[in-house]
């Protein structure tokens, strides 16, 4: 029987306490980051910088100088997209295959350099009943645009959660018609290449 993991619903507790504890449990080895991932709650909201140091996830409030990737989530979409994904993935499988945006923490310097050349925002538009939830990913030098991203990935919540679990790859969902790419697909492909 698997242990029930309590997932906090505030971004501060989730990022500063829960996520580092999950990394510690996962034992990701002695990997250190080539740079930081910036997590932003709302387009002009609170920010946290995340990085790996000898396998431990360090999360600090504010923007680090060496940000590689930005993840922006509207405040109202944090629980439905981030917390819900954590709840369905808790305790199952490899952490890095579950949390897409966190994968960038382990990339090497060469891939980090390639990621820095990406210009544009990839924004998931996730259909959740009557609501559309959004989470945007952009390289460090590009300001994220949730309203008019250069590339939009549209899917149902169930498919988004499958991606987060690591049980479906985005390209598999594109091929089956369950994930629709609108706009510049090249941006999504360039970002994806940095993770593999």
Where are these regions (language model features)?
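Feature captures hydrophobic
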Residues: 1-196
């Amino acid at each position: 029987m698997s242990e029930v993991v309590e997932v906090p619903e505030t971004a501060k507790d989730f990022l500063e306490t829960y996520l580092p504890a999950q990394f510690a449990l996962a034992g990701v080895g002695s990997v250190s980051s080539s740079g930081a991932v910036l997590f932003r709650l709302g387009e002009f909201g609170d920010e946290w910088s995340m990085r790996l140091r000898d396998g431990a996830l360090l999360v600090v409030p504010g923007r680090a100088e060496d940000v590689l990737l930005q993840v922006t989530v509207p405040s109202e979409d944090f629980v439905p997209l981030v917390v819900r994904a954590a709840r369905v993935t808790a305790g199952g499988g490899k952490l890095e295959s579950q949390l897409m945006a966190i994968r960038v923490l382990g990339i090497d310097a060469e891939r980090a350099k390639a990621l820095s050349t990406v210009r544009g925002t990839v924004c998931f538009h996730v259909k959740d009943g009557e609501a559309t939830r959004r989470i945007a990913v952009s390289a460090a030098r590009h300001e994220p645009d949730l309203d008019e991203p250069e590339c939009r990935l549209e899917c149902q919540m169930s498919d988004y959660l499958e991606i987060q679990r690591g049980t479906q790859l985005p390209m598999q969902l594109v091929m089956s018609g369950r994930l629709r790419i609108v706009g510049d697909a090249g941006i999504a492909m360039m970002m994806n290449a940095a993770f593999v």
